[in-house]
Regions:
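Short acidic, S/G/P-rich loop/turn micro-motifs used as interaction or catalytic elements
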Residues: 32-34, 60-63, 85-93, 119-121, ...
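Generic, well-ordered alpha-helical scaffold segments in large soluble proteins
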Residues: 33, 41-49, 84, 88-91, ...
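Conserved ATP-driven motor cores of ASCE-family P-loop NTPases powering translocation/secretion/packaging/pilus
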Residues: 38, 100-182
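Conserved P-loop NTPase "ATPase switch" module shared by AAA+ and STAND
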Residues: 60, 72-95, 111
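Loop/turn-to-beta-strand initiation segments
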Residues: 50-52, 76-79, 105-114
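Conserved P-loop NTPase motor module
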Residues: 1-29, 33-48, 129-131, 156-184
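Walker A/P-loop NTP-binding active-site region of P-loop NTPases
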Residues: 30-69, 116, 125-126
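Generic beta-strand/beta-sheet core signal
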Residues: 21, 28-30, 56-57, 82-83, ...
Length: 184
C-alpha cells in the first residue's frame, strides 16, 4: 500500500493508499492538474522502499525515454510509471513502446500506473483503480468514472487546485488532495 493523498469521505479526513500490488492504475486529468506530480511522488516513495522494480517512461523532445530506476531481483513485481501515455495508447500507435505498454497492461506481474489527459477505453478496461482530476466539464468528468454525487461536492475553486481529484477504486469514489512531490 502506497500513501499518496488525503482523502475526505464526508466524515473523516484520512490518508489515501494506492494498492500497487493488485492491478493497473489510471491517472486522468488535464495538463497542469497534478498527474506528473502524482507519478513522481509515488515513484520516489517506491524507489526509496526498494520493494519492487521501478520503470519510468516519459516523452522527452520527440522520443520516448524509459528509465529503469531500480531493479529488485528478490521481488517479482514491476511497477511501470508511464507519463503522458495518450499517444502510446492510441489504437494507431506503431512504436515499440506502445506494444510494450499494451503487453504490460495485460501482464499480472506488472502494475502499470499510466497518466493520460483523456479517458481511453484501452486503459480504462484494464484499470479498476483510478485517480481522476476533474476539469469542470461534467460530461468529461463522468466519462472518467467520477460519480455525479462526488462532482456535486466540488466548488469552482477546487478545479483550479493542482492535485485535487477523485480516488476511484472499484465502486467507491472519494475526493482527495494529492501530496506534492518534493524531489529526489
Amino acid at each position: 500500500m502506497l500513501p499518496f493523498a488525503l482523502s475526505d469521505d464526508g466524515v473523516l479526513i484520512s490518508t489515501a493508499f494506492l494498492d500497487v500490488g493488485h492491478g493497473n492504475i489510471a491517472v486522468i486529468g488535464a495538463c497542469g492538474s497534478g498527474k506528473t506530480n502524482l507519478l513522481l511522488c509515488c515513484a520516489s516513495r517506491l524507489y526509496e522502499s526498494g520493494r519492487c522494480t521501478i520503470r519510468f517512461t516519459r516523452k522527452t523532445n520527440s522520443e520516448w525515454t524509459t528509465d529503469d530506476g531500480r531493479t529488485s531481483p528478490q521481488h517479482e513485481r514491476t511497477i511501470w510509471f508511464v507519463d503522458d501515455a495518450d499517444e502510446l495508447l492510441s489504437p494507431f500507435a506503431a512504436m515499440p513502446e506502445a506494444d510494450k505498454l499494451k503487453t504490460a497492461l495485460a501482464d499480472p506481474s506488472v502494475t502499470v500506473i499510466a497518466a493520460v489527459e483523456k479517458p481511453q477505453s484501452t486503459l480504462l478496461e484494464r484499470c479498476l483503480t483510478r485517480v481522476a482530476f476533474p476539469c469542470g466539464e461534467r460530461a468529461t468528468d463522468v466519462m472518467m468514472g467520477i460519480p455525479s454525487a462526488v462532482l456535486d461536492g466540488f466548488g469552482v475553486d477546487d478545479y483550479a487546485i493542482a492535485g485535487r481529484g477523485v480516488f476511484i477504486q472499484q465502486a467507491r469514489a472519494c475526493p482527495v488532495q494529492c501530496a506534492e512531490f518534493q524531489g529526489f
